[in-house]
């Protein structure tokens, strides 16, 4: 698994790890059922605190993208369909982003084109 962790980035390292794994899932680099490195191993590999990796893994689990079991570790799991809670969270996240974009002067067409660009890249 290949992640880019930039210590000087304004994006927290846990978020960078989370987002890198999400990108790997979306791109198909990380497959359903594939184990992730242990928290300790990933922390050593990238020179970060294990608590930082744990935070990223916990968020992935909350997102429904991984499951963690004592014996098998953390494994990629892609839900077949989003839950009602996930759909509502998506709606809330998008609402906040769309409102901010509208307040900044973006037009609806610009916002839709940006969403299209982002999703086409990963489909």
Task: Name what the model sees in each region.
Residues 38, 72-78:
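Minor-groove-contacting beta-hairpin "wing" of winged helix-turn-helix DNA-binding domains
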Residues 1-35, 41, 81, 85-93, ...:
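Extreme N-terminal segment that seeds HTH/winged-HTH DNA-binding domains in transcriptional regulators
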């Amino acid at each position: 698994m290949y992640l880019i962790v930039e210590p000087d980035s304004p994006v927290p390292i846990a978020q960078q790890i989370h987002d890198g794994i999400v990108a790997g899932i979306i791109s198909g680099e990380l497959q359903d059922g594939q184990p992730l490195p242990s928290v300790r191993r990933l922390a050593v590999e990238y020179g970060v605190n294990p608590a930082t990796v744990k935070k990223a893994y916990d968020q992935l689990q909350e997102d429904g993208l991984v499951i963690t079991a004592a014996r098998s570790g953390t494994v990629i799991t892609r839900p077949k369909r989003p839950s009602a809670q996930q759909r509502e969270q998506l709606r809330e996240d998008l609402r906040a982003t769309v409102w901010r974009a509208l307040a900044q002067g973006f037009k609806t067409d610009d916002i839709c084109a940006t969403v299209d660009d982002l999703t086409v890249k990963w489909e």
